[in-house]
Each structure stands twice: as structure tokens, then as C-alpha cells.
């Protein structure tokens, strides 16, 4: 359900969801809007933002600003895929992602697809279990991507060479 794709400088921005929410007061209802966005540089940096405002464009702008301030770096494989299979959890949402061979594409649904596209991952198999709430899926996906370790990081931690790790 990705709506808008915009490029500013080297960042790719995607709007994942816009939601109308209401607050009931003595005089009736007050409506406001929430927006969920992801921002990435297609080279391993990704961030998400959640903005709330009385009007849709303002909510989207707030979400984009928060996403740009909330960016993290992901260690990608040279083939445009993941280093290894990973799992991520956030509240009721669980995600599982595994590397895929060249030409597979992004096999993922909804909010997870948008996160993977802006991160720069080109080949991946992914599945969401449990809650498919977009906010929780985005948080679980970024949580999983942050857990990913490169062979260099694992080799340094174990005190071995990269060749020994990749065997």
C-alpha cells in the first residue's frame, strides 16, 4: 500500500500508510491524520518516521523529517541481498528474511517491501507472521536488519579469518 515515491538528493522516500484518527470531545469529533514513511539511500541506510497532524500534507512532512533524523546503517552483501537469514520482532509482528539468488527480486509484502526497496536490497525472500500492522512490521523489519552481521564482523569477534568463517 505504498502511495508516494519521491527522490530528494540521494534519499528515496516512500509513504507507507496514511490513517485518519479521531478524538471525541464534548462538541463532537476532532479528526487528525497520521502518516508512516520510510527513507533510504538505496545503499544500506534506512529510517522510518511516524507523523501526526490535523492535515495530511503536514503529517507526511513531519513523518519524512523524523525518518531522515532516524536513519541507521545496514551491512549489505555485494550481491544486493542479505548476509544471512534473519528474524525480527516488534510487539505482535514477527518477520523472517532470507537471502535470495540474483534475479529473484524482492518477495515481500506491504510495508516490509517498502523498507527493503529504500534500503537497497534487490534480492530477498521475506515473510510476516502475526500482526500485519504497518508500524509494527516496519519496526520489526528494521530491527531484523540491524541484527545482521557481516562476515568481517563475525571474524573479528571470533578472532578468526574471513576464509574460516565463510567455509
Swiss-Prot record:
Domain S5 DRBM intervals: 11-74
Entry's Gene Ontology BP terms: translation
GO molecular function: rRNA binding; structural constituent of ribosome
InterPro entries assigned to the protein according to its UniProt record, in alphabetical order: Ribosomal_Su5_D2-typ_SF (IPR020568), Ribosomal_uS5 (IPR000851), Ribosomal_uS5_bac-type (IPR005712), Ribosomal_uS5_C (IPR005324), Ribosomal_uS5_N (IPR013810), Ribosomal_uS5_N_CS (IPR018192), Ribsml_uS5_D2-typ_fold_subgr (IPR014721)
One Gene Ontology cellular component: small ribosomal subunit
Pfam families in alphabetical order: Ribosomal_S5, Ribosomal_S5_C
Keyword field contains Ribosomal protein: yes
UniProt KW keywords: Ribonucleoprotein, Ribosomal protein, RNA-binding, rRNA-binding
Keyword set includes rRNA-binding: yes
Record comment regarding domains: The N-terminal domain interacts with the head of the 30S subunit; the C-terminal domain interacts with the body and contacts protein S4. The interaction surface between S4 and S5 is involved in control of translational fidelity.
Protein family membership: Belongs to the universal ribosomal protein uS5 family.
Function text: With S4 and S12 plays an important role in translational accuracy. Located at the back of the 30S subunit body where it stabilizes the conformation of the head with respect to the body.
Assembly with partners or alone: Part of the 30S ribosomal subunit. Contacts proteins S4 and S8.
Alphabetized PANTHER family for the sequence: MITOCHONDRIAL RIBOSOMAL PROTEIN S5
Protein name: Small ribosomal subunit protein uS5
Native organism: Baumannia cicadellinicola subsp. Homalodisca coagulata
Lineage: Bacteria, Pseudomonadati, Pseudomonadota, Gammaproteobacteria, Candidatus Palibaumannia
Gene name of this polypeptide: rpsE
Amino acid at each position: 500500500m505504498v502511495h508516494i515515491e519521491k527522490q530528494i538528493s540521494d534519499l528515496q522516500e516512500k509513504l507507507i500508510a496514511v490513517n485518519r484518527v479521531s478524538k471525541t470531545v464534548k462538541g463532537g469529533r476532532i479528526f487528525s491524520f497520521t502518516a508512516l514513511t520510510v527513507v533510504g539511500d538505496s545503499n544500506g541506510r534506512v529510517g522510518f518516521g511516524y507523523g501526526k497532524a490535523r492535515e495530511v500534507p503536514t503529517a507526511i512532512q513531519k513523518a519524512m523529517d523524523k525518518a531522515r533524523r532516524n536513519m541507521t546503517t545496514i551491512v549489505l552483501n555485494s550481491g544486493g541481498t542479505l548476509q544471512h537469514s534473519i528474524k525480527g520482532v516488534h510487539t505482535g509482528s514477527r518477520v523472517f528474511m532470507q537471502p535470495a539468488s540474483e534475479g529473484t527480486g524482492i518477495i515481500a509484502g506491504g510495508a516490509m517491501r517498502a523498507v527493503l526497496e529504500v534500503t537497497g536490497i534487490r534480492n530477498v525472500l521475506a515473510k510476516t507472521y502475526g500482526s500485519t500492522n504497518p508500524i509494527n512490521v516496519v519496526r520489526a523489519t528494521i530491527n531484523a536488519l540491524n541484527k545482521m552481521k557481516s562476515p568481517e564482523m563475525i571474524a573479528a569477534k571470533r578472532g578468526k579469518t574471513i576464509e574460516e568463517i565463510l567455509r
